[in-house]
């Protein structure tokens, strides 16, 4: 398995599970494989790999069926900044998505919740109120997840202005 990266390429380290080996023998694959689509899905048939020795001789084995791989959703991060305003609500408009694949873009909407309303750096944001939608550059929301990502907001101090008057003496 590997995380979504907008390509159909599967690298040898992405294939990690083998069944039917004898005793404690292990195998690996060599080369670079490919799948029919770059999008998130399970059990893609992979072409282009050959069996390679591990702690077992690959010449003692044949591939029975297909080599398969899963492409899992890419984990999105979010960063943003705004002035302290007495609220923990965080508008999508102050946040930017990070860890997008290639030149893909997504549309972010909704409202998140900051861990605090006061000034501070790297304030954690609960993203349950946000949603993503398909964007430009081939960005499909179904290829991404917020789960496991870092979602932070820098809250700057609000400017305070002091004015006064005094009587002429």
Pin down the residues of each PLM region.
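Short loop/turn motifs that initiate or flank beta-strands
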Residues: 1-168
